[in-house]
Design a protein with these regions (language model features):
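Flexible, glycine/threonine- and acidic-rich loop/arm segments that mediate assembly and lattice contacts
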Residues: 1-310
Length: 310
């Protein structure tokens, strides 16, 4: 029976496709606590960035002086120098002239969309380097790498021999480890760990709250606050880049203001650079050169070997 035209016959080729003009990007590239929250220190003026540290042990005995004694002068504590290498990270974008001329499904400019994605990818890589960077001085043909937070913490490190369930006592032990090493005003104030640890902390009881000062909550994710037995209040954040594989699952206890980013002077902060055209394309790169400054890692604590499940 003749019916003119239906969608089931060849006339379907005449119809505009039903293509949603909204693209949901669920890439995990926006959970970047440290890039968003760490302070920015003085600019690095060369590839090796250095700073001085001072630490004097607390008195553990009494050394009284007799009447009329001449003053004796002990050796004074000498400052030590710490350093880190700058690392160059980039996120390049290259589109053929034809592709750059054609709009995206959403109607947006193709080059603009790819540049936005590249910037998010760069920020994600900066975050990963901040947490897990492994120091390398570099050489001809070999890239420099900066030491990340995990690499910097060397004084207060505990590796459990077998998978250990994370308890409230363990959390307080971590905070006390920091308290034992440094002045009370420098005790850790952030716990960064895989999400399974945050879930365990959620069941710890009455010392826990979800309330956070608005100026502290720069990310949209929920940040829990724990009032420890030591007296220190710590933020507990779930972090995607802290080691979470079985056997190496890590909990980082950090004094946040003891870590900063320093960017290479003049050109180190993330920025866009057009690249020379050598063909029928448009190209450029988001690029940065920066390092992590660790003012004194002995205030922070690293523990590994936690159970990877609830």
């Amino acid at each position: 029976m003749a019916f003119g035209k239906q969608t089931y016959d060849g006339s379907g080729k005449e119809m505009r496709e039903s293509l949603l003009s909204i693209l949901k990007d669920v890439s995990p590239n926006e959970d970047n606590y440290f890039v968003s929250n760490l302070g920015v220190g003085s600019a690095a003026t060369q590839k090796t960035h250095e700073w001085n540290l001072y630490f004097a042990d607390r008195a553990t005995s009494v050394d009284p002086e007799i009447e009329g004694a001449e003053t004796s002068y002990p050796d004074l504590t000498v400052e030590t120098r710490s350093s880190n290498s700058t690392v160059i990270l980039d996120a390049p974008v290259k589109l053929s002239r034809t592709r750059a001329s054609i709009a995206m499904v959403s109607g947006e400019d193709a080059m603009g969309v790819e540049k936005e994605r590249a910037l998010k990818a760069l920020k994600s890589e900066m975050e990963y380097a901040t947490v897990n960077g492994s120091y390398a001085a570099g050489s001809s043909g070999v890239a420099r790498q900066m030491a990340g937070i995990d690499y910097c913490i060397t004084t207060n490190v505990t590796a459990w021999g077998s998978a250990r369930s994370f308890t409230e006592t363990d959390l307080n032990d971590i905070i006390q480890t920091s308290w034992d090493k440094v002045g009370a005003s420098y005790v850790i104030d952030v716990i960064a760990a895989p999400v399974v640890i945050k879930r365990r902390v959620a069941g710890f009881g009455t010392n826990l709250t979800r309330n956070v000062q608005a100026e502290d909550k720069k990310l949209t994710q929920e940040v829990r606050v724990y009032d420890s037995e030591v007296g220190q209040t710590v933020k507990v954040i779930a972090h995607k880049d802290v080691l979470k594989t079985a056997g190496t699952l890590t909990v980082l206890g950090l004094r946040e203001d003891h870590f900063e980013h320093s960017f290479l002077v003049n050109t180190g902060e993330p920025h866009w650079e057009d690249r020379a055209k050598s063909g029928d394309f448009e190209a450029g790169v988001y690029i940065t050169e920066f390092t992590l400054v660790s003012y004194d890692e002995r205030a922070s604590v690293k523990t590994t070997g936690w159970l990877s499940g609830l």
